[in-house]
Amino acid sequence: MYRATTRKIQVTATPRYVAERSEPDQGRHFWAYTIEVVNLGKVSVQLKSRHWVITDAHGHVEEVHGAGVVGEEPVLPPGGRFEYTSGVPLSTPTGIMSGHYDMLAETGETFSVEVPAFSLDVPHMARILN
């Protein structure tokens, strides 16, 4: 579990390797990740957009931008939470994801919230150290 808090918005990321959707011999690996967003502040906020940076073990970087998450732009009142699960494929058995959400406060202010960097690793993979 990976967690970051920005301006009283807490984001927790929990990745999980999905073996049944992966074909390691073909260079296809798939992870599901669950994100929980909690409003610890005193003002309602809306998640308006996302920006992901996905890096594989070869250093190949893919950036993903889009409105909301999983087709929604959730509103979180004070104390409110929103959770969703999505997925990401990689051609390598390890990688890392990070990013941010653009939020709109009920006051009209916009701000970015960090999504903590989280590791994408095939479980039980032998590690080679140089």
Curated annotation (Swiss-Prot):
One biological process GO term for this chain?
error-free translesion synthesis
Q: Which NCBIfam families match?
A: PRK05461.1
Matches recorded under Pfam families: DUF525
What is the protein's name according to its record? Protein ApaG
The chain positions of domain ApaG read 3-127
Under the heading PROSITE patterns, the entry gives:
APAG
The protein's superkingdom reads Bacteria
- Native organism is Azorhizobium caulinodans (strain ATCC 43989 / DSM 5975 / JCM 20966 / LMG 6465 / NBRC 14845 / NCIMB 13405 / ORS 571)
